[in-house]
Amino acid sequence: MKAIWHGGFIYTMLEEGDRTEAVYVEDGVIKGTGSYERLKEKYGSPETEEISLNGAVMFPGFVDSHLHLIGHGEKQLQLDLSALTSKDSILQAAKERERQLPKNDWLIGEGWNENQFETPDYLTKHDLDRLFPDRPVLLKRICRHAIAVNSAALQAAGISRNTPDPDGGVIVKDANGEPTGLLFDKAQDLILKAVPPVSQHYVDEALTAAIKDCWTKGLTGGHSEDLSYYGDVSVPMKAYEKAAAGGKYPFRCHLLVHHEAVDRWEQLEKLSGPYVEFGAMKIFADGALGGRTALLKEPYQDDPSTNGVQVHDDETLGRLIRKAREKGMEVAVHAIGDLAFEKVLNAIEKHPPKNGRHDRLIHAQVLDNELIERAARMPIALDLQPHFVASDFPWVIDRLGKDRMKTAFAWKTLISKGILCAGGSDAPIEPVDPLLGIQSAVLRKSSHEQNGPSYNESECLPVYEAIKLYTEGSAGIIYKEKSRGKIAEGYDADFTVLSGDPFAIDPAQLHLLEIKKTVINGQIVYEKS
């Protein structure tokens, strides 16, 4: 296919403010940029289509650098609790969902967040047992680092007062030693192993739903981690083969491989082509701030009895990174707390990646000046989730204390130190919409407050830097800085077309911009009617 795109504002992202009048695309690759007349004279032919932007604004395709694609699709299919603001509303929604289920199915929901309740108390089995005495119920907290289950689910998993905490996890127990139904991090696996395996059809349906939804948000690709959560690795692999690899639903899928899945993954035939590729080995170093399981150097201010959860001891973390090196892989490590981040840096220093390569540290929410300086000297890149600011403030201030907040969520500082940073959502934990992430990076305001302040305003990013996270950053973090993330000759023809110019509007209106078109490999996959 040959096409000349013109008639709008085309930002190349080669440098701030740089625009071109027209773009010529052939077989999914940009072959020329410049004036419309010059490109028409050089490339115009009966086979060359002319596509007018009708005044719309084109960018290199936005790419989410960290999400869980199949999980995002599940959120479209399952009980979504993320907008509910009380235990009663959650229980009512769960009861309504139960009416749609076969008799023996588990009831599974996604996204509860006690910080949205008037009284921020966790869900427990006592809440759930009142309405669900017999059917197993599993409700995932929004961070996916905690779950609330009822007694039937505990019984199905064989969890009792005598069950010890697994390494890297916590089974919360009451004063009498009885499980409360709340489980954190690796303890969740005890429940998840008892849940009947999902079908191939279910995973296929979830992935397709996710890709289609991402198109509507202007996303042309995503770096996803979901190969270890749906039974055998072959199940999600087949889903990616059916949906994306053959081009049925074009989407640039860069897949991380969880360390628990990597050996099985190696045994399977690898998918290839322009839409599916594999990247680093995924490891979790800690939990999340919402459940106080992110690993901190000092205890939580609002609960001095804990400083979080270390998912792997130092020796195991080092062994896992060494395993990745033996397989010729980099690592992508979830590290939210400062102590987790420090331990990951220590392990990477002992087992560095090959020259010219870098490891990925995901989230990097709570740091200190020493860690930031150290990270800037090391072969690492950071996956940032700007919308965490909108979700976590203001409650996170009481959780961490004001002193730690000075270098928390420090996106601008990290970028200023020359660290390669990319932008993502962590969907389904946060909304997948990149415009919400860009707006959060620019404004740093809470979505829980009307007309609230900008938190740590000195860390607000200019609009250009925020968009770079989702273009140049997402390309560079997977070594594609010379083929994606810019509109220039030789780059992939992946475009996000907006209804308005993000550089010319009030940043508070960024999320109101419409996606006019999403273009992948030169093909229009989504167009607003």
Curated annotation (Swiss-Prot):
Gene3D superfamilies: 3.10.310.70, Metal-dependent hydrolases, Urease, subunit C, domain 1
Family annotation (SUPFAM superfamilies): Composite domain of metallo-dependent hydrolases, Metallo-dependent hydrolases
InterPro entries on file: Amidohydro_3, Metal-dep_hydrolase_composite, Metal_Hydrolase, YtcJ-like
E.C. numbers: 3.5.-.-
Coiled coil regions, renumbered to chain: none
MF (Gene Ontology): hydrolase activity, acting on carbon-nitrogen (but not peptide) bonds
Broad class of enzyme this protein falls into: hydrolase
Keywords: Hydrolase
Family: Belongs to the metallo-dependent hydrolases superfamily.
PANTHER family, alphabetized: IMIDAZOLONEPROPIONASE, PROTEIN LONG AFTER FAR-RED 3
Protein's UniProt name: Putative amidohydrolase YtcJ
Species this protein is from: Bacillus subtilis (strain 168)
Taxonomic lineage from the root: Bacteria, Bacillati, Bacillota, Bacilli, Bacillales
